[in-house]
Regions:
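Hydrophobic transmembrane alpha-helices and immediately adjacent juxtamembrane helices
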Residues: 1-203
Length: 203
């Protein structure tokens, strides 16, 4: 009720500036400790698809296409494909973590409820989830960059410049995915995100 002394319009409105603190860091560490037990299977799963793209399309179709000309410079098709695979993997990894994994922690496992029994606010949890998803994306693309170096697809020092750019991609897509997460009633809702937004973004 507006006349009630406990009524606070600022708390009732969802449109407010986030109240952030350093308490997001223990939440981030918690996700890291849990994930560390599954790091190897997670890594293999994240790099399997782009690796198949590189082998099937890069070497297979690359033998037919040969080289592309970009800004007057010849570029091997596999290098062209690998660059897109890196961006696609960053988008996928950040989105998947901020959708399915974060939704499970929020609704299924009730992890967020347990964390909020400590002096940690919801804004700190959301920030930790966003940064964690971005970290997962950065970890994934680092592995793919390692594959590119191992297969001698590229040795350009510009690969180092890709890290901050891909971190920005991870933060951007994890933020958008968390918005969908907040609106979702179940896992099926995420199909709209992948079908109508993420997949067209790859092209």
């Amino acid at each position: 009720m507006p006349d009630s002394p406990a009524y606070n319009p600022q708390l009732q409105s969802p449109w407010r500036a986030p109240r952030l603190s350093l308490r997001f860091w223990p939440v981030f560490q918690r996700n890291l400790l849990v994930w560390r037990k599954l790091a190897i299977p997670s890594l293999l799963g994240n790099i399997a698809e782009p690796l198949m793209w590189l082998v099937a399309f890069g070497y297979g179709m690359g033998a037919l296409v040969g080289q592309l000309t970009i800004d007057g410079q010849p570029v091997p098709y596999i290098l062209f494909l690998a660059s897109g695979s890196i961006c696609m993997s960053a988008m996928n990894a950040a989105s998947f973590e901020a959708l399915y994994s974060a939704f499970s922690r929020m609704h299924v496992q009730k992890t967020w409820d347990g964390i909020m029994n400590a002096p940690v606010g919801l804004d700190d949890i959301v920030l930790a989830e966003m940064l964690w998803a971005a970290f997962k994306a950065l970890f994934t693309v680092t592995a793919i960059l390692g594959v590119m170096l191992a297969l001698q697809i590229s040795h350009s020092p510009k690969l180092l410049v890709a890290w901050p750019v891909l971190l920005g991609v991870g933060i951007t897509f994890s933020s958008m995915a968390l918005v969908f997460n907040a609106l979702a009633k179940g896992y099926d809702f995420f199909t709209y995100y992948f079908t109508l937004f993420l997949t067209p973004s790859m092209f």
